[in-house]
Amino acid sequence: MQDLKQQLESLIDGDVSDSQEELERASHDASLFEIVPEVVVAPKSAEDVAKLVEFVAKHKSEHPNLSLTARSAGTCMSGGAVNESIIVDMNKYLTDIGEVEGDEITTQPGAFYRDFEPKTLKHGKLMPSYPASREICTVGGMVNNNSGGEKSLEYGKTEDFVRELEVVFADGNTYTVKPLNKQELDAKMAQGDFEGNLYKELYELIEANYDAIKSAKPNVSKDSTGYHLWNVWDRETEVFDLTKLIAGAQGTLGFVTNIRFGLVPSATHKGTLVVFLRDLDDLGQIINDVLKHKPATFEGFDNYTLMLSFKLFFFFRKTLGWWGMMKLGLQLLPDAFKLMRGIPKMVLLIEFDGETQEEVSERVHNMREALRPYGHEALFEENETEAKSRKFWIMRRQSFQILRKKVKDKHTAPFIDDLVVPPEHLPEFLPEVREIINKYELLATIAGHMGDGNFHIIPLMEIEKQSERDKLEPAMKEVNELVLSYGGSLSGEHNDGLIRGPWIKQMYGADMFGIFKEVKHIFDADNIFNPHKKTDATWEYAKEHIRQEF
């Protein structure tokens, strides 16, 4: 579109840029992909966002490629924050964080979680669905991807903490989205305007396919694929909650401009048991036994992650500073000596919390005693305070950043990075997925949320080579088929984006995929919001935009 920059500059109060530096920055996120936009816009207000949506809707028929994609920190691993038209940078100005009021707090989507959390902790509260990228992600990305993390085992995902949203829909107006009872829903559907018709059409779609939609819900503890229609309308409670659909829609149904989160009390005391597993033979039973003790968090990472953490030890200086890094090194010495006697196949982190340190210590000790019969006790380290286990938490939380920033000859290729399998199947599943990794000669680390069976497998590849890129599709197909054969999900946290959007139909089947397409049409008939994700994603398009240079 000619003069796009000038038209947008005259329209909004925010910034509009088409500088080479800004376009390059916005052309990629943390995924495999690179798409150069026409312009990058930084709105200064929700009114600016509404004007942008209205502008694109008005000119879409004349300029079919015109569209909008929201972006904040650019940490999306699925390619959800890239677009060849207009990138809307929410992270520059829309960063206001309100005050805690009871068990809730309101914030704009561009706020970093690292700035958001201290405000809640001052009141003894926490929004617990933060991902491992908590230091670099924004709350808007958490909502749009329906993020989860180490505390999701106990508390659930971001969709469980969204109380209310301000959303700009395709007509360019801003609407409040929150749970409605049946009387409120009926009144909404009777309005006869854009909003009323949206609610009416969505309600009728869900009602007409109620049983099919409910049965389509993935049988796993966490999921970020498709559209979560099964959580929107419940006949028994007669609650219609559109926030459950917007959370995880990856910006394909509208633009979130304000969020009201629910909060939980933050833990007073924590303690972690670190387990070094010599082998994975009894992993399934160990997981079942651990879950009986109801830990707050149950994480794990493999021997490749552990070895890389030692090899790239100086990376931690950026996170911890020189003194912190040296302290970490001293703490790691005993473990380094243990590793000389044999690298564990997996490191488990089992965290408990409680009202007193005595309660936590007892729970950690009981967990250790329950696992002692498995014969791994020589490699146990019991941690009765969080500080002692901090070194392992750093390895777990920083694992992707270590790979992304510090392995020079290869690049992170997150394409099988977020699969979920019911935990009872992990002893069979993990060796099988490692066979596929080895078959395609991929160097890959495995880390994840053991209690949810949610694993982040991150291959390191020379992705600029055609021979390496040719591995992506067949390897992904094999892993996807394996995951689905165990009743799993293709994404627990990172969402669909460019990388998994093409496989939604494979996961849900043609009928449910057709219902998803109807949802997209109800909200965004002209496809102005974040194209090539979810229902209009194709592998052909994704493949054309794999990043060539890093």
Locate predicted features:
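N-terminal flexible segment immediately upstream of the FAD-binding catalytic core
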Residues: M1-L66, A73-D103, Y155, T252, ...
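Short amphipathic alpha-helices in soluble, non-transmembrane regions
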Residues: L8, F55, I286-V290, V360-R372, ...
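N-terminal glycine-rich flavin-associated loop
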Residues: L8, L32-P64, L68, I86-S133, ...
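Flexible, glycine/charged-enriched surface loops at secondary-structure junctions
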Residues: D15-Q20, H63-L68, M127-Y130, E207-G226, ...
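Extended, hydrophobic alpha-helical segments in both membrane/secreted and soluble proteins
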Residues: L68-A70, M77-S78, F116, N146, ...
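Mobile "lid/hinge" segments at catalytic clefts and subdomain interfaces of large enzymes
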Residues: V139-K311, I343-L349, F516, F523-F529
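Terminal amphipathic helices with adjacent charged low-complexity linkers/tails
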Residues: K292-K410, T535, Q548
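Intrinsic disorder at enzyme termini
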Residues: A510-F550
